[in-house]
Regions:
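Glycine/small-residue-rich loop that forms an oxyanion/phosphate-binding "nest" at active or ligand-binding sites
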Residues: 14, 32-78
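Alpha-helical scaffolding within the catalytic cores
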Residues: 7-14, 42-45, 96-100, 120-125
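Acidic-and-aromatic substrate-binding clefts and catalytic sites of carbohydrate-active enzymes
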Residues: 1-8, 32-37, 65-68, 117-123
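N-terminal binding-site loop/beta-alpha segment at the start of enzyme catalytic domains
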Residues: 1-23, 53, 76, 143-146
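Structured loop/turn residues at beta-strand edges in well-structured enzyme cores
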Residues: 18-21, 50-53, 84, 108, ...
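Extended hydrophobic secondary-structure segments that form protein cores and membrane-embedded regions
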Residues: 25-28, 114
């Protein structure tokens, strides 16, 4: 919702010859929409904007410092799942201690933790922890994000695809740096 792309995505799906059932559709609960009632209202808004009655994956965009509020939000996520408004639910940018809070709570575990993940940010501890609990890791920046300060005018160019080691490997195998990074992801699980 925060990216402002739901209307365009919905229009694209509606105008496409591809059936909705053949599209895996993910959207996110924005930070301002945490809490039980707000989360329930937010998914309904997203579904209306997307022009669909369900998403395949609904994600909490960012963990909250307030554990009680996070638990109320997760209660809403479970209801969204139970009501069929999402076929699976997950989180973004959660570290092991955030995931542990949901594990300790009991109930439905996140199907996915979507995080920045690439050869320069390998997230080994998180990947191991999530794997032990059956939580899939999905990269929101598989070819490398910006370096340094992240988003906006202070961000720096992607350094993964211009990494000399990745370039050397790409040259050795006659592939592009992007193909090498994708192969790394596949081999890393």
């Amino acid at each position: 919702a925060a990216y402002g792309n739901e209307a365009g995505v919905g229009e694209g799906i509606a105008s496409s010859p591809v059936l909705r059932a053949d599209v895996f559709l993910t959207t996110k609960l924005w930070n301002a929409d945490h809490g039980y009632e707000r989360a329930l209202a937010a998914v309904d808004t997203s579904l209306r904007t997307l022009g669909t009655d369900y998403v395949d994956l609904y994600l909490i965009h960012w963990p909250l410092q307030d554990r009680d509020q996070l638990m109320r939000t997760w209660d809403a996520m479970e209801k969204i799942l139970a009501d069929g408004k999402a076929h699976s639910i997950g989180v973004c940018n959660f570290e092991p201690h955030h995931l542990q809070a949901l594990i300790d709570r009991g109930g439905v575990l996140p199907a996915v933790d979507q995080v920045e993940l690439h050869p320069h940010l390998q997230q080994r501890e998180l990947r191991e922890f999530a794997g032990e609990h059956g939580i899939a890791i999905e990269s929101w920046s598989p070819l490398g994000g910006t370096s340094g300060s992240g988003w906006g005018p202070n961000s720096k160019p992607n350094t993964v695809l211009s990494d000399p080691t990745i370039g050397d490997i790409a040259a050795k195998y006659g592939r592009s740096p992007a193909q090498i990074v994708i192969a790394w992801h596949i081999r890393s699980g």
